[in-house]
């Protein structure tokens, strides 16, 4: 995949999917950078896994999601979060037809989005890839989500050489593993950090 354009010559349609405040905080600078770059057409899809704090991050960065799945329901189980996210992201992929899907971290929303993209044969880019504790149950379910996401990822963007090395020890193709730190600092006065 190149960053020049799609096969039709237009900008790359990159779907960024998140559902929690930490994901939003980490992906918001990427969303705004892509919106300022004519090579990209970012599509923001929010699952709403953690509804209450997403809006303040969106307001801070001036982001209006293209699609809000609004899956949050009091007392929902991990199975319900996964099911609602998988179905909702699947519908969003069919509607927007992205060239790639970006997920961040280890949430259930990230796992479901990666799986939906894989099912639609859309490349997955995983930001903050390769983090491992060595115990699939700790933290739960995040460690399992990390490992599952890595199985369907086309490009692993690792925050450290240690996380890169974790993926290489798991026999991940070195050609799809990059050490990549987000190239932007925390904005001054950012109260949402």
PLM-predicted stretches and their roles:
Residues 38-84, 88:
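Conserved nucleotide-sugar phosphate-binding/catalytic loop shared by glycosyltransferases and other
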Residues 2-48:
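N-terminal subdomain of nucleotide-sugar transferases
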């Amino acid at each position: 995949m190149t960053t020049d354009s799609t096969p039709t010559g237009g900008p790359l349609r990159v779907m960024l999917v998140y559902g929690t405040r930490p994901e939003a905080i980490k992906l918001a600078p990427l969303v705004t950078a892509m919106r300022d770059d004519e090579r990209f057409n970012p599509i923001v899809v929010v699952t709403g896994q953690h509804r209450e704090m997403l809006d303040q991050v969106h307001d801070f960065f001036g982001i209006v999601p293209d699609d809000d799945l609004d899956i949050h329901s009091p007392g929902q189980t991990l199975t319900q979060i996964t099911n609602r996210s998988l179905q909702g992201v699947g519908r969003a992929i069919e509607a927007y037809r992205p060239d790639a899907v970006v997920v961040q971290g280890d949430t259930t929303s990230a796992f479901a989005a990666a799986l939906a993209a894989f099912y639609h044969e859309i490349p997955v880019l995983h930001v903050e890839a390769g983090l491992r504790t060595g115990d699939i149950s700790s933290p739960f379910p995040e460690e399992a989500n990390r490992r599952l996401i890595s199985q369907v990822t086309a490009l692993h963007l690792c925050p450290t050489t240690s996380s890169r090395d974790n993926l290489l020890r798991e026999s991940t193709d070195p050609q799809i593993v990059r050490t990549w730190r987000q190239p932007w600092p925390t904005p001054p006065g950012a109260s949402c950090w």
